[in-house]
Amino acid sequence: MSFRIYSLHLSWSRKDKIIVNRDCHQSVINTLILGDIEPAYIYPQIDNKTNILMGIKIEDAIDTIDKNLDAKAILLTYPTYYGKVYDLKTICNYAHSKGMMVIVDEAHGAHLGLSDKLPMTALEQGADIVVQSTHKTLPSFTQSS
Protein backbone atom coordinates (compact mmCIF):
# COMPACT_ATOMS: atom_id res chain seq x y z
CA MET A 1 0.00 0.00 0.00
CA SER A 2 1.44 3.38 -0.96
CA PHE A 3 1.99 6.01 1.70
CA ARG A 4 -0.52 8.24 -0.09
CA ILE A 5 -3.20 5.65 0.53
CA TYR A 6 -2.05 4.97 4.06
CA SER A 7 -1.99 8.65 5.07
CA LEU A 8 -5.45 9.28 3.68
CA HIS A 9 -7.00 6.25 5.37
CA LEU A 10 -5.48 7.21 8.72
CA SER A 11 -6.59 10.81 8.53
CA TRP A 12 -10.20 10.77 7.38
CA SER A 13 -13.51 9.01 7.61
CA ARG A 14 -15.98 8.00 4.95
CA LYS A 15 -17.78 10.90 3.28
CA ASP A 16 -15.08 13.41 4.31
CA LYS A 17 -13.95 15.79 1.58
CA ILE A 18 -10.44 16.65 0.43
CA ILE A 19 -9.23 18.98 -2.30
CA VAL A 20 -7.02 17.29 -4.90
CA ASN A 21 -5.22 18.44 -8.01
CA ARG A 22 -6.92 16.64 -10.92
CA ASP A 23 -3.63 15.40 -12.38
CA CYS A 24 -2.78 13.49 -9.20
CA HIS A 25 -1.37 9.97 -9.15
CA GLN A 26 -3.83 7.17 -9.87
CA SER A 27 -3.32 5.77 -6.36
CA VAL A 28 -4.94 8.93 -4.98
CA ILE A 29 -8.04 8.36 -7.11
CA ASN A 30 -8.14 4.72 -6.00
CA THR A 31 -7.90 5.80 -2.37
CA LEU A 32 -10.72 8.29 -2.76
CA ILE A 33 -12.91 5.53 -4.18
CA LEU A 34 -11.91 2.87 -1.64
CA GLY A 35 -12.19 5.26 1.29
CA ASP A 36 -15.47 6.79 0.09
CA ILE A 37 -13.80 10.20 0.35
CA GLU A 38 -15.30 13.05 -1.68
CA PRO A 39 -12.85 14.93 -3.93
CA ALA A 40 -13.01 18.58 -4.90
CA TYR A 41 -10.71 19.00 -7.88
CA ILE A 42 -8.31 21.76 -8.87
CA TYR A 43 -7.66 21.54 -12.60
CA PRO A 44 -4.12 22.19 -13.84
CA GLN A 45 -3.02 24.72 -16.41
CA ILE A 46 -2.15 23.22 -19.77
CA ASP A 47 0.44 24.69 -22.11
CA ASN A 48 -1.45 25.01 -25.39
CA LYS A 49 1.70 24.67 -27.48
CA THR A 50 3.06 21.48 -25.88
CA ASN A 51 -0.03 20.11 -24.08
CA ILE A 52 2.13 19.72 -20.97
CA LEU A 53 0.46 20.10 -17.59
CA MET A 54 1.96 23.17 -15.95
CA GLY A 55 0.68 22.77 -12.41
CA ILE A 56 -2.11 24.65 -10.71
CA LYS A 57 -2.69 28.39 -10.53
CA ILE A 58 -2.71 29.97 -7.08
CA GLU A 59 -6.04 31.66 -7.85
CA ASP A 60 -7.63 28.31 -8.74
CA ALA A 61 -6.37 26.72 -5.52
CA ILE A 62 -7.66 29.59 -3.37
CA ASP A 63 -11.00 29.59 -5.20
CA THR A 64 -11.39 25.83 -4.70
CA ILE A 65 -10.52 26.15 -1.00
CA ASP A 66 -13.07 28.96 -0.59
CA LYS A 67 -15.76 26.88 -2.30
CA ASN A 68 -14.99 23.81 -0.16
CA LEU A 69 -14.42 25.08 3.38
CA ASP A 70 -15.70 21.75 4.70
CA ALA A 71 -12.69 19.95 3.18
CA LYS A 72 -10.37 18.33 5.71
CA ALA A 73 -7.24 18.73 3.59
CA ILE A 74 -5.70 19.61 0.28
CA LEU A 75 -3.49 17.08 -1.54
CA LEU A 76 -1.18 18.44 -4.23
CA THR A 77 1.49 17.12 -6.59
CA TYR A 78 4.70 19.19 -6.38
CA PRO A 79 6.59 19.36 -8.62
CA THR A 80 4.39 18.15 -11.45
CA TYR A 81 5.32 15.02 -13.38
CA TYR A 82 6.99 17.36 -15.87
CA GLY A 83 9.06 19.12 -13.21
CA LYS A 84 7.00 22.29 -13.08
CA VAL A 85 6.81 24.05 -9.71
CA TYR A 86 4.44 26.70 -8.42
CA ASP A 87 3.98 28.85 -5.32
CA LEU A 88 3.15 26.08 -2.88
CA LYS A 89 3.89 28.25 0.16
CA THR A 90 0.99 30.59 -0.56
CA ILE A 91 -1.36 27.64 -0.95
CA CYS A 92 -0.09 26.02 2.27
CA ASN A 93 -0.54 29.24 4.23
CA TYR A 94 -4.04 29.80 2.86
CA ALA A 95 -5.14 26.19 3.45
CA HIS A 96 -3.81 26.32 7.01
CA SER A 97 -5.68 29.58 7.65
CA LYS A 98 -8.87 27.69 6.75
CA GLY A 99 -8.01 24.78 9.06
CA MET A 100 -6.95 22.35 6.34
CA MET A 101 -4.03 19.96 6.40
CA VAL A 102 -1.69 20.03 3.38
CA ILE A 103 -0.43 16.74 1.93
CA VAL A 104 2.06 16.85 -0.94
CA ASP A 105 3.05 14.11 -3.37
CA GLU A 106 6.67 15.13 -3.92
CA ALA A 107 7.63 11.93 -5.73
CA HIS A 108 9.30 13.91 -8.50
CA GLY A 109 11.01 16.31 -6.10
CA ALA A 110 13.10 14.16 -3.77
CA HIS A 111 16.16 16.01 -5.10
CA LEU A 112 14.93 19.51 -4.23
CA GLY A 113 16.59 19.66 -0.82
CA LEU A 114 20.03 18.91 -2.23
CA SER A 115 20.85 22.43 -3.43
CA ASP A 116 19.76 25.96 -2.62
CA LYS A 117 19.71 26.57 -6.38
CA LEU A 118 16.66 24.31 -6.66
CA PRO A 119 13.12 25.26 -5.65
CA MET A 120 12.21 24.85 -1.98
CA THR A 121 10.87 21.50 -0.82
CA ALA A 122 7.23 21.06 0.14
CA LEU A 123 8.20 20.81 3.81
CA GLU A 124 10.11 24.10 3.59
CA GLN A 125 6.97 25.68 2.15
CA GLY A 126 4.70 24.49 4.95
CA ALA A 127 3.29 21.10 3.92
CA ASP A 128 2.15 18.87 6.80
CA ILE A 129 2.71 15.47 5.16
CA VAL A 130 5.06 14.87 2.23
CA VAL A 131 5.38 11.67 0.23
CA GLN A 132 8.67 11.27 -1.65
CA SER A 133 10.06 8.65 -3.96
CA THR A 134 13.79 8.53 -4.54
CA HIS A 135 13.54 6.17 -7.52
CA LYS A 136 12.14 8.91 -9.76
CA THR A 137 14.82 11.60 -9.50
CA LEU A 138 17.67 10.11 -7.46
CA PRO A 139 19.86 7.03 -7.98
CA SER A 140 17.95 4.20 -6.34
CA PHE A 141 16.20 1.01 -7.33
CA THR A 142 12.57 1.13 -8.44
CA GLN A 143 11.67 -0.94 -5.38
CA SER A 144 12.88 1.88 -3.11
CA SER A 145 9.75 3.89 -3.77
Descriptions of predicted regions:
Residues 1-145:
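Conserved PLP-enzyme active-site core in the AAT-like
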